[in-house]
C-alpha cells in the first residue's frame, strides 16, 4: 500500500507493484492543484479531508494524498488517481488523528507519477513534517543551492538520490528547508523560509501537533480559512469548507502565514501584500460556487457572457454552452442578446475534464467520449457556442465537426477569455466566426481592479520577475514564457 511514515517512499511500477526506482523525467507539481488542511481534535479529520479534496477535485485529477497526525506520528497515504479511486473506507479508517492535510494534483509540465504526488514527507530534528503545495516556484535554482548548503546530512546527500524527491521538485526543496530547524521551532523556521520563495504558492503543512498555512505575497492562488465547531480548516476554495459544514471566516491574506494548534489561531505576515490574483481562477480554474476576493465566480462568468454578447453580437437561433465550464457565460450571452438558451450537447459525466488530462492522446480520445450533439436541438439552426477558453483548438474543432454532422447550419464560437494566438487557433477550428472577450471586458467582469489581478497568461506581464530560463530548474511556464500578445479580433472562417 502507498503509505509513508518514515521518510522512505515507494511508488507503483509498470507492473503495478511498488518500486523505489526514480523516474528521471519527474518534475515538480504545478499551479492548478487543490490543498486542504484541518485541525479538529475529536473529529474524523481523514474523512473531513477526503470530502474537502472531493470538493476540490476539479483542481487536479492525477493524484491525491492525505497526511494525518495523532500527536505522536504522521502517516501519509497517497497514490495516482481521483480522490475516490485513491481512498476507500478501510484506508480512511486507518488514518486516525486530530489534524490532517490533503492534496489533489494537476501537472502542467511535469510527469504524472507517484513521486510527484503530495503531501511530501520529511523527518525533522524533533519529529516530522508533511507539506502540500499549490503553485509554481521560479527560484528553484536558489532553493536547491540553499538545501545543498545545509549542514549535516541534508547538505551531504544529493537530492536527486533521495527516494521520493527529484532535482526539479520545488515542493521537496521547500519541505527540506522547512524540516531543517535544529535550533528553532518549525514556526520560526517557516518565517525564515517563506521570504526566500519566489513565485506563486499556497502551502498547507503540519508537524505532529500543529497545522500551518501560507499564501504568497501576490495571492496568486486562492486560500481560505474556515471554522468548525471543534477546530479550523483551510482550503483552496470556500466551496470545500461549505462541503464539510465549516463556516467561512476569511481569505488567507497575501503574505500571511497561519499557525493553528491547541492554543488557537495565530497569524504572521512574512511579506508586504501585493495582490495579483490569477484572473483564470474566475474564467476556469475555480468552482462556479466559489467566492474569490468577495466576488462570486458564477456571477463573474455570467457577466463575461454578457460582455461577449456586447462585443461580438451575431444573428443566431440558439445560444448553447460547452458543458459544464461554458454554461454560466452562455447564460449571460443569451440574457444580453435575447437569443434563446438551450443545451446542444449531452455530457458523459464519467469522463474527466479534457484540459486536466495530462496526455495529448487521452485528450483527443476524451473529446468523443465526453460530448455528443443533441441532433433535435441543433439541426437547421444557427448556433452560438460559448466556452471559457481555447487551449489547443482540438476540443473546439471536434465539437464543431459534431455539430455540423448533426445538421447545424452555422456555428459561431464565443470564448469568455482573451485570445492567445489568432493565427494558430482561429484558422484551424472550422467555425463560421470566432470571437473572444477583450482583456478589459474580462477584467471588468471579475469586479476586481486591474492592478489586483495577474493576467500573465494573456499579456505576458508577470507579477514577479522571472529569472533566466536556464535557472528555473524546470520548464515551469513553457506555454507562456514567449509572452504572447493578446489580440482582439473576429476572423470569419470558411466552412470546412
Task: Give residue ranges: language-model regions.
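Conserved short alpha-helical segments that host acidic/polar catalytic motifs at enzyme active sites
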Residues: 2-254, 259-316, 322, 410
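Secondary-structure transition/capping motifs at alpha-helix termini
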Residues: 153-157, 183-184, 313-317, 335-342, ...
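A conserved beta-strand->alpha-helix junction
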Residues: 167-168, 172-175, 341-352, 429-446
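Amphipathic alpha-helical
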Residues: 172-184, 323, 331, 335-353
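PRPP-dependent phosphoribosyltransferase catalytic core
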Residues: 194, 209-210, 245-247, 251, ...
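Flexible glycine/proline-rich, aromatic-decorated loop/lid segments
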Residues: 230-237, 354-368, 408, 413
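Extended, hydrophobic alpha-helical segments in both membrane/secreted and soluble proteins
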Residues: 319, 326-333, 337, 341, ...
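Short, glycine/charge-rich flexible loops or terminal/linker lids adjacent to PRPP-binding catalytic cores
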Residues: 338-383, 394, 420
